Amino acid sequence: KYMPLLMTAAGTIPPAKVLVLGAGVAGLSAIATAKRLGAQVEASDVRPEVKEQVESLGAKFLEVKSDSDDGVGEGGYAKETSDEYKKKQAELLEQRVADSDIVVTTALIPGRPAPILISDDMVKSMRPGSVIMDLAAENGGNCGFTKPDEIVDINGVIVDGTINIAGTMSVHASQLYSKNVSAFILHGYDKEKKEFNLEDEIVSGSMFIHAGEIVDERTKSAIEGSN
């Protein structure tokens, strides 16, 4: 299927409809790419404050009406939502998913399995030839049919659960990773004292173990829960 609107002597072909779930770094990049290719793009996120970012890229923001900041967690990251919110979200997405040619899912919750946003019934409502690209597959996926590192066909609908996508672009992935590691070290390391500044919130927020003790609360909870 073509992505952009095409007007030809033989008739008009409407643009592809792309739905992006999760408007973090990956989601915003997917929105920008789809718009650049000429698609009609909609996006949704549990954090209402990203609406401006989504709309600045030319996409329509699908907002779940809620009286609270239900999906906003510590540091502005997404968190687990209430059952009532999930019900409203499912009602909002049901028809949008059915109408989409491509669905890109990127929704993740720090320290938790990826939330299921696309039910089995939603997948079955999509047209044959439609594609779901589940970028959350490594954490379980946002689609019920997702199988990590596999591509499955559900009645003609392709569900792509490829993991480590960055590894397919290894040269640039390595460049970006090394640049970020260097920036982190240069920011947090005190050259004169030859030690990391533990009072820096970036350093302290990235630390798992110090002086032989687990200092990260999520890591501590996960270990205690497995015992």
Feature-to-residue mapping (PLM):
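Short, ordered loop/turn segments at secondary-structure junctions
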Residues: 46-48, 66-67, 108-109, 136-140, ...
